């Protein structure tokens, strides 16, 4: 009897225990590297953006232009690098999932937190309409392209080229906006630290991509879902940190410009830049449905801000609820 128990333990329990230990080890390593990568992204992006603002103010750009172009490029650098690396590794689902998820996060969660941190403030209807329309147009183009299940180099070129075109459309709106004045510190100092910050972002993005691939394999979960929910939140941390800091300093135009500007980049440029060099397949059903939900939320957000011309805790709560509902709405579709 004892021999049978010993044989059972050796044949069944020991292998099961070893499998469990290997699973736990791989999961722990994957999660650890994901956290390290996201932390590196957040810290590096904050420094890169801080000194990018220094460069922009030295050039006497307006607050809205700083937020819409300069800061948004800086805070969106994780998504841009993630797009290139994931596409190069033939994991376009990570690229699209991260970009679409980032649009949802920035247009709902990030914008929704503004009035809870800095109180209610006014928004200019024409500014939010023009910026919002650009974001929605770019997103419509992206969603229509991913539904085919493949992003070609021509599709990617269109998405990348649309960003400077959309920025030109908004240029006239910001001509009369006052600049922030002179910045402290030397221009070369800000330039050097910005470059170092962006290098840190690139390293963090590579770590995140590798950890997502590993975790998806360990838990048998779609790379797209992990990217849409977890990675997108992580790569949106720079927007959250920078924008909430700007809100506390009453720099509302920088915060609004960055949140919407980052969404414009994510909706087109971010997806396109990786697939421009490395075209590839994407899981069309997932991308289409998640993209349509994020697009609907974007339209609701822009419409509410344009109609009310102010952003308070009522609209903030609505936007945060839209973000929370994404988890229920999207999982209910599959």
State each model region's role.
Residues 1-334:
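Hydrophobic alpha-helical segments, chiefly the membrane-spanning helices
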